[in-house]
């Protein structure tokens, strides 16, 4: 999703592969996968980010997701 990241592509790709394998193991359709991933993002924000920064970070994440979808399909 991010164009510039402080994380190495290899690390991101390995974690992504693991998450995809779990979703495939459970035969999760797209809508269930999105619910699970959305809940994961919410959990990360509420458990690891201060209340004063949650909305800002959620908006930045949402914007990056929308830009990623627009970029990949146009």
Curated annotation (Swiss-Prot):
SS bonds (residue pairs): none
Superkingdom of this protein's organism: Bacteria
Family according to the record: Belongs to the UPF0352 family.
Protein name: UPF0352 protein MS1910
Organism, scientific name: Mannheimia succiniciproducens (strain KCTC 0769BP / MBEL55E)
């Amino acid at each position: 999703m991010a164009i510039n990241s402080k994380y190495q592509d290899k690390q991101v790709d390995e974690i992504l592969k693991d998450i995809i394998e779990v979703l495939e193991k459970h035969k999760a359709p797209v809508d269930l996968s999105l619910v699970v991933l959305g809940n994961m993002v919410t959990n990360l924000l509420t458990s690891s980010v201060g209340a004063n920064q949650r909305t800002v970070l959620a908006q930045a994440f949402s914007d990056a997701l929308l830009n990623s979808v627009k970029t990949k399909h146009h």
